[in-house]
């Protein structure tokens, strides 16, 4: 699935933060040609040949897992606006994709529901130090934090219908995270009663981390504020580069975080340094 840098930074349905209409051409053309290049370059089967913009789809692995691939970037995302986060008309998925996704979850007969999508769904607070800082708000506005009404709708759908074993797989922010996705009753002391699902965020292979967006000062502040202000965030690594391996079986789904010592040596090896899992029929992470 694509994210924003196949077109322009912080892209949405009708534009992008890094696109100036007119002087950089028409957004509709830029998006069309970028998606054409993506489709021609990557071996991806389009779920709807009549609609080149639709990439959301389901991949089934027997009765073990359904993998839902979403488009939280280009298909029907409204422009980022943090002040509209609780507006029910402010969409990340859009109505058509959301209806499809909710129906698939509701009717799933697979043991695990793995959701691959672009931006972090778990809440992120910088506490009183950072929450009012515009640069930090802009970061959150591009995540599900900027579309809280839609996030709450998904959480309600999962819990009200007792949909189990939902695991979110995320990229975008070039850093590593292991998160419970909390409800309003989340408690750090008893996360099992307040988590709706879990999330693993993979870092980038070589691209810079959050310091490239936030600046080194805010990034350093964030590093010290994440755990005290976000008890549902179980692990975060803002510095190292690497990849994740997701291991799914009937007992549990586990994410192994692999990192390299340096990104400048082609023959450098990788090491698994952190392991988190969720058990079958549980909604909160455990450390392996």
Language model segments and positions:
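Metal-dependent phosphoester/phosphodiester hydrolase catalytic core
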Residues: 1-288
């Amino acid at each position: 699935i694509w994210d924003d840098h196949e077109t322009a930074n912080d892209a949405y349905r009708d534009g992008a933060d890094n696109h100036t209409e007119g002087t950089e051409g028409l957004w509709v053309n830029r998006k069309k040609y970028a998606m054409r290049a993506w489709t021609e370059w990557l071996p991806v089967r389009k779920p709807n040949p009549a609609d080149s913009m639709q990439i959301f789809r389901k991949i089934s692995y027997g009765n073990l897992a359904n993998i839902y691939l979403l488009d939280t970037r280009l298909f029907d995302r409204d422009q980022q606006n943090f002040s509209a986060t609780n507006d029910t008309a402010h969409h990340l998925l859009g109505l058509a994709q959301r209806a499809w996704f909710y129906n698939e979850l509701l009717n799933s007969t697979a043991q695990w529901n793995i959701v691959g999508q672009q931006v972090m769904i778990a809440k992120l607070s910088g506490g009183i130090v950072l929450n009012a800082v515009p640069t930090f708000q802009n970061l959150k506005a591009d995540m599900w934090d900027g579309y809280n009404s839609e996030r709450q709708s998904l959480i309600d759908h999962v819990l009200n219908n007792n949909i189990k074993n939902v695991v979110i797989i995320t990229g975008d922010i070039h850093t590593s995270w292991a998160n419970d996705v909390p409800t309003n009753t989340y408690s750090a002391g008893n996360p099992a009663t307040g988590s709706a699902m879990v999330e693993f965020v993979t870092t980038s292979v070589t691209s810079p981390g959050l310091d490239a967006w936030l600046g080194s000062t805010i990034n350093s502040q964030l590093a010290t504020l994440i755990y005290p202000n976000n008890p549902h965030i179980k692990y975060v690594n803002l510095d190292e580069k690497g990849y994740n391996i997701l291991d799914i079986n009937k007992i549990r789904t586990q994410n192994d975080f692999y990192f390299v010592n340096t990104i400048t040596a082609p023959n450098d090896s990788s090491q698994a340094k952190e392991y988190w899992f969720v058990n079958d029929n549980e909604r909160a992470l455990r450390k392996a």
